[in-house]
Curated annotation (Swiss-Prot):
One of its GO terms (molecular function) is isomerase activity. Signal peptide: none annotated. It comes from the Bacteria. Its EC number is 5.3.2.-. This is Probable tautomerase stu1128. It comes from Streptococcus thermophilus (strain ATCC BAA-250 / LMG 18311).
Amino acid sequence: MPFVKIDLFEGRSEEQKIELAREVTEVVSRVAKAPKEAIHVFINDMPEGTYYPHGEMKKKN
């Protein structure tokens, strides 16, 4: 049962997240030979100020 976690800065619309989840499901199903019903996509909206690569705050562009 594939689980896919996607972390994004918040700000995408519900429609964009639905499209992303559907497209990711299609690719994982095709490549991993997994039934779509078994694939779970988690999209985490990260608020600005919660991501610190290399110890520095990352701001969305």
